[in-house]
């Protein structure tokens, strides 16, 4: 696998995560964030190693932001 293919997978994986986030905002259902986050992770991971990496980075950032804002572990 080439470095460029990894970067392409990561970019597409990040787009998958963004699409899930946008869909969550549009749906506007209470307590639906875990579903949409899981869907984004799954879609990104299907892209390959780059997508898995992007999903992990974005998920870790989400958890760290929630900790910083004082949300408990039940929200992650």
From Swiss-Prot:
Membership in a protein family: Belongs to the SAA family.
Protein name: Amyloid protein A
Lineage: Eukaryota, Metazoa, Chordata, Craniata, Vertebrata
Alphabetical UniProt keywords: Acute phase, Amyloid, HDL, Secreted
Compartments, record wording: Secreted
Disease tied to this entry: Reactive, secondary amyloidosis is characterized by the extracellular accumulation in various tissues of the SAA protein. These deposits are highly insoluble and resistant to proteolysis; they disrupt tissue structure and compromise function.
One example of a Gene Ontology biological process annotation: acute-phase response
InterPro entries in alphabetical order: Serum_amyloid_A (IPR000096), Synovial_Prolif_Regulator (IPR052464)
GO cellular component: high-density lipoprotein particle
Pfam families: SAA (PF00277)
Gene from which the chain derives: SAA1
Tissue-by-tissue expression: Expressed by the liver; secreted in plasma.
Principal place of residence: secreted
Entry's induction text: Upon cytokine stimulation.
Function recorded in the entry: Major acute phase reactant. Apolipoprotein of the HDL complex.
